Amino acid sequence: MLDDAPALLKDKNFLDVLHNEWNKRIVGEITAREIIFAMGLGGCLCLNAQKTSNNLIVNSKSGSGKDYLTTQVLNIIPGKESKWIKRTRITKTAFTYWHNSTIEPNWTWNNKIFYGEDMNSEMINSDVFKVICSGENYSTIVKDQKAIDLKINGKPSIIITAAKAILEEELLRRFAVLNLDESKEQDDLIIDFHSKAAMNEGLLNYDESVMKALDGLKPVSVIIDFADKFGKYFKEMNANVIVRTNYNRFIDLIKYSAVLFQHQRFWLDGNTIKAEPEDYDRAIEWFTHLFKNQCLIPITKDQQKLIQIVQTLGQTTVDEIISEVTFAGRTWTYTNLNLLTEKGLLEKTRIDDESGFSKKKLDTYTATGQTKIKLPYWVDLE
């Protein structure tokens, strides 16, 4: 612990204090708030995490408040435009020219958060965006019929919101998907919250002393000396190759928690701290909120709805599925049936058309069944 650290950062109820601040502007979504904050600030300050572990998509239908929630969570971090940078509209090549290292050689994305609001599939799946999401340093563009290498300095935490984005397979390895609460109960909480605000002076401002205290967090490396205790539980999952990426993501969530609580951790040297069991338990909560099944495949709310439709119908044809999909169009449904089949969440079978109108084969889909992810808390570790 550093003696000169702000008192807030030495408080075991540090996150509760932050929730009290967020409660001034947000209602519900307790775990979602923590994930956005941890992957944003903890992610950009962790020196020895995987470069893709701090990439997050906040997903929910249009009008659900995902942009508002994400903005209000990040607003508690001081240094907007210096420590965290928000853009509402951005082109797919912007990162190639933005803070170009030729013009700004000393500028870096390290220790920063990039928040992209309402990004579309074209932008998310673009080559340049893949480069920065991977933490790679160079992209090549063609200008005046010449190939030019441009350097991207550093790697930020990347948080984006999206309603209908379709992630290509390559992006699935680089992003976790945070699905928000779309329940009637959450709707009612939001209505009551804004009604109360309207009866008073509106939304309250965050306490500046709390915001300033967050400046006391510094970039550190994290050692997990108990990491050999939980790997076996991931080996038991039916997660195929993606377990390699998401196991590292789980490890890094432990590290992000330790980074946020660094002034309550043992310092091995001036730049390295040790994670504690409570960091493991916190990572369990965050990880099982992000990944609902043992396949460890990130899926959006709409993709989950599509799986549930197929599950309800049993073995069923594309036309029957499309007639039940009221939240998206035919093209989206075709695309996502194929994507979910590739991920192993649906099974595709060709059968004879028994209607008598055609001799063609029909594609049918069946839900494979998803086993809910279960990971033990520290007290239950063997």
Question: Where in the sequence are the language-model features?
Answer:
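Charged, amphipathic alpha-helical linker segments immediately N-terminal to NTP-binding catalytic cores
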Residues: 1-33
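Non-catalytic, well-ordered alpha-helical scaffold segments
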Residues: 33-37, 169, 173, 244-252, ...
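Conserved ASCE/P-loop NTPase catalytic core
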Residues: 34, 39-197, 348-352
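Short, hydrophobic-biased segments on the C-terminal half of alpha helices
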Residues: 74, 251, 334-338
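Interdomain motor-coupling "hinge/lid" segment immediately C-terminal to the ATP-binding subdomain
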Residues: 173-239, 251, 258, 267-270
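C-terminal helical "lid" subdomain and adjoining coupling/linker elements of P-loop NTPases
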Residues: 228-299
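Terminal-proximal interaction/regulatory segments of ATP-powered molecular machines
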Residues: 297-382
